[in-house]
């Protein structure tokens, strides 16, 4: 196995960086800074960052097959036009819950945009519980709701054979699996495939590799962990020089690099001194496994 290298490739000082997505066409990493209401695009060749500011906390971003991007902004699914920096609302959820916002989101293999909600936090991971739900935006722009009673809707991905949906509700301290129907988008038969250990802290964003193993960013745990969802065993731990690791994705050449987002919010002045790269973007190389390209939203 090659030696693992971790480097901070962008000192962005994100309040809460999230939702890293690799855009192969531009050799860029997309990500968001939720409370700053910014969608960012880092060009891995020029090292330049472009930013678009929206009108509410933006919690996830995804590629769109017809061009541009889609994002979850407040409680809205939006289409994002990068050139003129405009956001067009495609659908709105949780209209009766004024204190809610979207959190993590990702597009499924059929081109639906899955995303879940949560109550606004009063401090990191401190919030009114069971206020969230999981939704998906179909290509025809109608929305389906899967379930409610969610604390912090978070990481999500699909198995390589497209038969299992993996999902994290952070405060359950569990990675869950559902049977998944690619044709209809329906999910069923929820079960836990991994329970986090105490030092791993809070499960946050997640991605899958070509071997069908899950990578989970552990908020307050300063690490990403690799899990085997079939055996429930942890296979690997990669520790980072920041505590508040939030999400991860594969990207770069052949999707052999991992990009990890993290947060500064919640660190006191001492913590910020000890973790000067908090809020930055990290690249991990030498993992010896590749990821898969992100699916684009087809609506």
From Swiss-Prot:
Protein family membership: Belongs to the SMP-30/CGR1 family.
Keywords carried by this UniProt record: Ascorbate biosynthesis, Calcium, Cytoplasm, Hydrolase, Metal-binding
This protein's GO CC annotations: cytoplasm; nucleus
GO MF annotations, alphabetized: calcium ion binding; enzyme regulator activity; gluconolactonase activity; zinc ion binding
SUPFAM superfamilies: Calcium-dependent phosphotriesterase
Keyword Hydrolase listed: yes
One Pfam family from the record: SGL
Record pathway: Cofactor biosynthesis; L-ascorbate biosynthesis via UDP-alpha-D-glucuronate pathway; L-ascorbate from UDP-alpha-D-glucuronate: step 3/4
Signal peptide as annotated in the record: none
Main function: Gluconolactonase with low activity towards other sugar lactones, including gulonolactone and galactonolactone. Catalyzes a key step in ascorbic acid (vitamin C) biosynthesis. Can also hydrolyze diisopropyl phosphorofluoridate and phenylacetate (in vitro). Calcium-binding protein. Modulates Ca(2+) signaling, and Ca(2+)-dependent cellular processes and enzyme activities.
Modified positions (N6-succinyllysine) in chain numbering: 244, 253
Record-given protein name: Regucalcin
Protein's organism: Bos taurus
């Amino acid at each position: 196995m090659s030696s693992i290298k971790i480097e901070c490739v962008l000192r962005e000082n994100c309040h809460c960086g999230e939702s890293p997505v690799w855009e192969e066409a531009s050799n860029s990493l997309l990500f968001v800074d939720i409370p700053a209401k910014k969608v960012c695009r880092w060009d891995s060749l020029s090292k330049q960052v472009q930013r678009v500011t929206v009108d509410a906390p933006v919690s996830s971003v995804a590629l769109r097959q017809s061009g541009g991007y889609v994002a979850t902004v407040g409680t809205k699914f939006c289409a994002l036009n990068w050139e003129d920096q405009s956001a067009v609302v495609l659908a709105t959820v949780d209209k009766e819950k004024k204190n809610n916002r979207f959190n993590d989101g990702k597009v499924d293999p059929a081109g639906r945009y899955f995303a879940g909600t949560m109550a606004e936090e009063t401090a990191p991971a401190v919030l009114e519980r069971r206020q969230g739900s999981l939704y998906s935006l179909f290509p025809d722009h109608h929305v389906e709701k899967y379930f409610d009673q969610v604390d912090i809707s978070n990481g999500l991905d699909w198995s390589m054979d497209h038969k299992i949906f993996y999902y994290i509700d952070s405060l359950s301290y569990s990675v869950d699996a559902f049977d998944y129907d690619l044709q209809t988008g329906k999910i069923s038969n929820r079960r836990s495939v991994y329970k986090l250990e105490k030092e791993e802290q809070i499960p946050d964003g997640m991605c899958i590799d070509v071997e069908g193993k899950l990578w989970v960013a552990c908020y307050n745990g300063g690490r990403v962990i690799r899990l085997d969802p079939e055996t429930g065993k942890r296979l690997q731990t990669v520790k980072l020089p920041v505590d508040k690791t939030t999400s991860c994705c594969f990207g770069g050449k052949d999707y052999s690099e991992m990009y990890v987002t993290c947060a500064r919010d919640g660190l006191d002045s001492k913590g910020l001194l000890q973790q000067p790269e908090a809020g930055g973007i990290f690249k991990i190389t030498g993992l010896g496994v590749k990821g898969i390209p992100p699916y684009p939203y087809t609506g």
